[in-house]
């Protein structure tokens, strides 16, 4: 629309100049006390009117005639066909300056238009009664911002630019997520699988290290990437690329920034919808509640839950078997009582002085079914070596002279100690009571 506007204005000025030059009646002007000068060509057209009956000086008529070829030269420069008039007008340096000033003049109106478009968009995507309500919008990225990148930020090697792809961690499950995501989007805002994968990965970031500003910067980078991909398509057409390169650099930067904001608005709308509907699009992890209501890092929370289950074979135990075994081995090795073994029968006898073992009670692990299962992290042989001496400390004292009179079942051997440990709870806390 801008190009058509400037074409119409330029053609009207040329046509009026031609009519004035070909007629006997001169153009009228209200001087307002301004004296004509020889360099009156630089005066703006805002002071000239095509209506009036006053007679003006001949030098003003000459001014109009001298201004006419100047406009004609600008308009007809490079024009071969009228269909290309819009492109030629944009190539004029003066037209480029005017176009650069237009965004500043219409900034207020543009903000109102953006606000109205945002309200209409939100109203359009508002769910119906049977759909869940929109969640917290505190993390939304503003859509009222106009992004302007410098020429240096637009410099890029188009040949090395990579297209949008689905991340490897989302392959195989991106289609149902994309379909659920598209159900909450406008008809003209349907996301692609690549866009869904990128936004999904953004919501998995740790927000303590990557606040909302990081999300905004990443969306700007994705929008810039989309513009450069479009520009690479234009580069494939040689004639179209030549026309693009003939434009003045300020005008090219303006066009790129306009396309950037179009891509950016799309990314922002998609991001806001996805983060609002995250629990409805991908769903929370089963039997797992994330602290502080944060559902943006469900994959990491699920991984942490799985890791904790692997660390402890019994969830109710505060420490795993490996760490308990190390502590017990260190303490019992230092306080192990001295033993004497009879080579004839293999029985173990201890001093008559009882050994204090109340300090070792908290370190004794409970021998349950899970302890004797194959899932135990500590080898069974090492447990026998560590527990054998301490368990034998609970055996009653037997006189070596009476060992021949005692039945063989009453002699506490290494085999009995291992059996005691393997039964896991049949014996009481003290072996002498069980015997």
UniProtKB/Swiss-Prot annotation:
Residues 1-22 form the signal peptide. Keywords: Host nucleus, Secreted, Signal, Virulence. Its main location: secreted. The RxLR-dEER motif acts to carry the protein into the host cell cytoplasm through binding to cell surface phosphatidylinositol-3-phosphate. Belongs to the RxLR effector family. Secreted effector that acts as an elicitor that induces cell death in host plant cells. This is Secreted RxLR effector protein 35.
């Amino acid at each position: 629309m801008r190009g058509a506007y400037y074409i119409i204005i330029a053609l009207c000025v040329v046509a009026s100049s031609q009519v004035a030059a070909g007629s006997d009646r001169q153009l009228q002007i209200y001087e307002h006390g301004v004296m004509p000068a020889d360099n009156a060509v630089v005066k703006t057209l805002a002071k000239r009117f095509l209506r009036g009956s006053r007679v003006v000086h001949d030098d003003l008529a000459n001014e109009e005639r001298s201004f006419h070829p100047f406009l004609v030269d600008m308009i007809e420069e490079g024009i071969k066909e009228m269909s290309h008039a819009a492109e030629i007008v944009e190539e004029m340096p003066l037209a480029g300056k005017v176009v650069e000033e237009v965004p500043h003049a219409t900034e207020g109106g543009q903000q109102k238009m953006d606000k109205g478009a945002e309200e209409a968009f939100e109203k359009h995507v508002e769910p119906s009664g049977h759909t869940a309500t929109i969640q917290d919008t505190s993390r939304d990225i503003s859509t009222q911002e106009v992004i302007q990148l410098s020429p240096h930020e637009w410099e890029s090697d188009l040949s090395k630019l990579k297209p949008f792809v689905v991340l490897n961690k989302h392959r195989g499950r991106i289609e149902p997520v994309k379909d659920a995501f598209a159900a909450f989007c406008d008809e003209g805002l349907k996301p692609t699988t690549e866009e869904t994968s990128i936004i999904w990965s953004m919501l998995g970031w740790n927000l303590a290290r990557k606040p909302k500003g990081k999300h905004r910067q990443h969306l700007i980078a994705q929008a810039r990437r989309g513009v450069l991909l479009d520009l690479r398509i234009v580069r494939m057409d040689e004639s179209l690329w030549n026309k693009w390169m003939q434009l003045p650099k300020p005008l090219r930067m303006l066009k790129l920034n306009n396309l950037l904001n179009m891509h950016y608005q799309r990314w922002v709308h998609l991001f806001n919808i996805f983060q609002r509907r995250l629990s409805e699009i991908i769903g929370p992890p089963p039997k797992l509640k994330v602290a502080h209501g944060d559902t943006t890092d469900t994959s990491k929370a699920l991984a942490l839950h799985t890791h904790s289950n692997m660390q402890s074979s019994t969830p109710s135990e505060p420490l795993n078997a490996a760490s308990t075994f190390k502590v017990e081995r260190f303490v019992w090795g230092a306080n192990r009582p001295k033993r004497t073994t009879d080579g004839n029968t293999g029985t173990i006898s201890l001093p008559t002085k009882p050994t204090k073992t109340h300090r070792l009670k908290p370190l004794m692990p409970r021998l349950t079914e899970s302890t004797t299962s194959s899932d135990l992290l500590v080898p069974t042989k090492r447990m026998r070596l560590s527990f054998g001496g301490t368990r034998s400390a609970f055996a009653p004292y037997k006189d070596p002279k009476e060992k021949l009179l005692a039945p063989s079942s009453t002699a506490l051997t290494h085999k009995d100690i291992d059996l005691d440990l393997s039964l896991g709870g049949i014996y009481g806390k003290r072996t002498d009571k069980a015997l």
